[in-house]
Swiss-Prot record:
<feature type="binding site">
    <location>
        <begin position="20"/>
        <end position="27"/>
    </location>
    <ligand>
        <name>GTP</name>
    </ligand>
</feature>
<dbReference type="GO" id="GO:0016149">
    <property type="term" value="F:translation release factor activity, codon specific"/>
</dbReference>
<dbReference type="InterPro" id="IPR031157">
    <property type="entry name" value="G_TR_CS"/>
</dbReference>
<dbReference type="InterPro" id="IPR000795">
    <property type="entry name" value="T_Tr_GTP-bd_dom"/>
</dbReference>
<dbReference type="InterPro" id="IPR009000">
    <property type="entry name" value="Transl_B-barrel_sf"/>
</dbReference>
<dbReference type="Pfam" id="PF00009">
    <property type="entry name" value="GTP_EFTU"/>
</dbReference>
<dbReference type="GO" id="GO:0006449">
    <property type="term" value="P:regulation of translational termination"/>
</dbReference>
<protein>
    <recommendedName>
        <fullName>Peptide chain release factor 3</fullName>
    </recommendedName>
</protein>
<feature type="binding site">
    <location>
        <begin position="142"/>
        <end position="145"/>
    </location>
    <ligand>
        <name>GTP</name>
    </ligand>
</feature>
<keyword id="KW-0547">Nucleotide-binding</keyword>
<keyword id="KW-0963">Cytoplasm</keyword>
<dbReference type="GO" id="GO:0005525">
    <property type="term" value="F:GTP binding"/>
</dbReference>
<dbReference type="Pfam" id="PF16658">
    <property type="entry name" value="RF3_C"/>
</dbReference>
<dbReference type="Pfam" id="PF22042">
    <property type="entry name" value="EF-G_D2"/>
</dbReference>
<dbReference type="GO" id="GO:0097216">
    <property type="term" value="F:guanosine tetraphosphate binding"/>
</dbReference>
<keyword id="KW-0648">Protein biosynthesis</keyword>
<dbReference type="InterPro" id="IPR035647">
    <property type="entry name" value="EFG_III/V"/>
</dbReference>
Length: 529
């Protein structure tokens, strides 16, 4: 059998996530990207069936109420000659752990920056995570229909704060009420902006060349002159686009536009599909796995509960690393050492699920999970592999969780363990008492847990403050030393949702003392799934 059709499918795939600070316009960009992919016909409206008002990529109840993307959705759409898998990551301040893990499942990222504000805190944190794997980054400077900071300043800030070289591909002409469009440096043409076209794909009005008198006539002599002067400076001072540096994560192409006005998004998508890598090889503990291998491999990076409230189901999101998924195929669930038959995997269009007939390396599929699949699990066509680099992060905030009705302890524990398996929260059970301590990376996670315990497990829970500053996973190669450590630190030890031994420190001083007293013991701030 010829391998050509399979290789052509894999080479078409582009799998990326959007990273940004909350409110930089990520959900709007997602909508406009889908519009260009013709996945939806009018934007504003990334809306599923049955709702006329909610953006389609935000679909849990709480997200609808608060207007934030709390869970990671996956959307697939065609663009140019590629098939794009877009992973939407939670944009809200709090939802970082899920976001970090999603970044392990993509081959490139789109960084969205609010051009009025520049580099913000959350963007820095997310960039640090992409650095762990040198992920290629494309940058979109958003909100040019508002008054923005000086574009040169923005480039300098990205370079100095995020430690990545910038190569502008387009350049803005004016901003706010004066925003006229962008000049595309690589194509030597000006694309003019029309207002009020945000919900549809704009008919492009293009002026060829920088010295074309039509440019002065359209944007006004002053702005045209300003553009020529700025470009002279920019082209002299900034980097040219370099594919090799981009693929190493050392340089980012920069596009300017307004997602709300649906302008410039297509230039960015053109760049992304032209330059971003097709599915990359991935490191397993045993060896590196190439996307073009014909045997299937994949790993689970996220578990999402109740995507369909009518069915209490959980979906495990799997990134296919190599080979092809076909309906009804047998897979080896490596952690359990068990052969499973997968006949009902799903593909995604944010909340609209359809059964996958076939999927290829680079694609994300959903497996129905009845409690046997965990984050980090590897599935193969026989080989015993474990993909590495899907981390759990030590929580930064802690609360004790308590029941209003003490008879529901069993349901509470079941609910918390399931929520911790899907990464919504981490749960710790101290060895010395029956407390249940919940750990999160952001405050909003606590609200989500209580809301979901109520709607999914019919358990009413409340929080109390607890004297915990931080948690560390404990490991020690010397069984005798570990035993001594456990005897002397009973009051500070707990088991997490996966029964891993954890040190719960009331203060950072306490943690540092414990480290000094037991140098043989490792206190880890992250744990691989």
């Amino acid at each position: 059998m010829s391998n050509a059709p399979f290789l052509s499918e894999v080479s078409k795939r582009r799998t990326f996530a959007i990273i940004s600070h909350p409110d930089a316009g990520k959900t709007t960009i997602t909508e406009k990207v889908l519009l260009f992919g013709r996945a939806i016909q009018t934007a504003g409206t990334v809306k599923g069936r049955g709702s006329s008002q909610h953006a389609k990529s935000d679909w849990m109840e709480m997200e609808k109420e608060r207007g934030i993307s709390v869970t990671t959705s996956v959307m697939q759409f065609p663009y140019n000659d590629c098939l794009v898998n877009l992973l939407d990551t939670p944009g809200h301040e709090d939802f970082s752990e899920d976001t970090y893990r999603t970044l392990t499942a993509v081959d490139s990222c789109l960084m969205v920056i609010d051009a009025a504000k520049g580099v913000e805190d959350r963007t820095r944190k997310l960039m640090e995570v992409t650095r762990l794997r040198d992920t290629p980054i494309v940058t979109f400077m958003n909100k040019l229909d508002r008054d923005i900071r000086d574009p040169m300043e923005l480039l300098d800030e990205v370079e100095s704060e995020l430690n990545i070289a910038c190569a502008p591909v387009s350049w803005p002409i004016g901003c706010g009420k004066e925003f006229k469009g962008v000049y595309h440096i690589h194509r030597d043409e000006t694309i003019l902006y029309s207002t009020g076209q945000g919900h549809t794909i704009q008919e492009q009005r293009i002026i060829k060349g920088l010295d074309n008198p039509d440019l002065d006539a359209e944007v006004g002599a002053d702005l045209a002159e300003q553009l020529r002067e700025e470009l002279e400076l920019v082209l002299g001072a900034s980097h040219e686009f370099d594919q090799e540096m981009f693929l190493k994560g050392e340089l980012t192409p920069v596009f300017f536009g307004t997602a709300l006005g649906n302008f410039g998004v297509d230039h960015m998508l053109d760049g992304l599909t032209d330059w971003a890598p097709a599915p990359l090889p991935r490191q397993a503990n045993e060896r590196a796995v190439e996307a073009t291998e014909d045997k299937f491999t994949g790993f689970v990076f996220k578990i999402q509960a109740n995507m369909d409230p009518k069915h209490r189901d959980r979906i495990a999101f799997m990134r296919i690393v190599s080979g092809t998924y076909t309906q009804g195929m047998k897979m080896n669930h490596v952690r359990l050492g068990k052969q499973v038959n997968i006949s009902d995997a799903v593909t995604f269009m944010a909340g609209d699920r359809s059964r996958a007939e076939a999927a290829y390396a680079g694609d994300i599929i959903g497996l129905h999970n009845h409690g046997t699949i965990q984050i980090g699990d590897t599935f193969t066509q026989g080989e015993s592999l474990k993909f590495s680099g899907i981390p759990n992060f030590a929580p930064e905030l802690f609360r004790r969780i308590r029941l209003r009705d003490p008879l529901k302890q069993k349901q509470l524990l079941k609910g918390l363990v399931q929520l911790s398996e899907e990464g919504a929260v981490q749960v710790f059970r101290p060895l010395q008492n029956n407390d249940l301590i919940v750990g999160a990376v952001g405050v909003l996670q606590f609200d989500v847990v209580v809301a979901r315990l109520k709607s999914e497990y019919n358990v009413e829970a409340i929080y109390e403050s607890v004297n915990v500053a931080t948690a560390r996973w404990v490991e020690c190669g010397d069984a005798k030393k570990l035993d001594e450590f456990q005897r002397k630190n009973q009051t500070n030890l707990a088991l997490d949702g996966g029964d891993n031994l954890t040190y719960i420190a009331p203060t950072m001083v306490n943690l540092n003392l414990a480290k000094e007293r037991f140098p043989e013991v490792e206190f880890r701030a992250t744990r691989e799934h």
